[in-house]
Amino acid sequence: MLTRKQQELLLFIHERMKESGVPPSFDEMKDALDLASKSGIHRLITALEERGFIRRLPNRARALEVIKLPEAYSPSLQPRRGFSPSVIEGSLGKPPAVAAPAAAKPIADNGNSVSVPVMGRIAAGVPISAIQNNTHDIVVPADMLGSGEHYALEVKGDSMIDAGIFDGDTVIIRNGSTASPGDIVVALVDDEEATLKRFRRKGASIALEAANPAYETRIFGPDRVKVQGKLVGLIRRYH
């Protein structure tokens, strides 16, 4: 299965070659997918080549050949510029709604509770492709939130269990792009993978640290990681 960004790049190359017969340049691909650097395009092309969707033709500049398209190909699915928050496991292969999280809405109980949008499932484990999908709303105590915009994510995975975050929990996230060392954040890696990890700095690099010794800390250059919000609360259902 392709990630959202891999599929967007493949379809962008396919549509450009249909129009002009020439593959787009790396700069054009970077701009179309709203990536920070061309290194992200190189990684996506390598992944597509390894999966058998494209082929690089030797001894020719900008020489790419599309071998096949995804089974769920839709001509209306085009690269989109920016999305927030970035979450996982929603409607992969379908055009997502591109709506930012709304401010939490008070409900009719004297203002003691508010409704927060649940934007999908976040990986507390190996990062999965980042897409946006507002699935439903959840009611939380108003004093859990404070100021700012908030959204909720359902946790998938066990990499944060030592921080008390378990598979199936719902985390409440304050939307934002900054974090302090030690904060648990929603991090977007290479504009295509979203994960829930503890934020650290290692010199000029960013470390995404799990709270489970079975998972390694992942180190990235600062241009590869975007903070999408900080953990402010957690909800657990007992069955």
UniProtKB/Swiss-Prot annotation:
Quote the function comment for this protein: Represses a number of genes involved in the response to DNA damage (SOS response), including recA and lexA. In the presence of single-stranded DNA, RecA interacts with LexA causing an autocatalytic cleavage which disrupts the DNA-binding part of LexA, leading to derepression of the SOS regulon and eventually DNA repair.
Catalyses which reaction(s):
Hydrolysis of Ala-|-Gly bond in repressor LexA
The positions flagged as active site in the entry are 159 (for autocatalytic cleavage activity), 197 (for autocatalytic cleavage activity)
Subunit description: Homodimer.
What is the protein name stated in its UniProt record? Answer: LexA repressor
Which GO terms fall under biological process for this protein?
DNA repair; DNA replication; negative regulation of DNA-templated transcription; proteolysis; SOS response
Keyword terms of this UniProt record: Autocatalytic cleavage, DNA damage, DNA repair, DNA replication, DNA-binding, Hydrolase, Repressor, SOS response, Transcription, Transcription regulation
Listed EC numbers = 3.4.21.88
**Which Gene3D superfamilies has this protein been placed in?**
Umud Fragment, subunit A, Winged helix-like DNA-binding domain superfamily/Winged helix DNA-binding domain
Q: What family does this belong to?
A: Belongs to the peptidase S24 family.
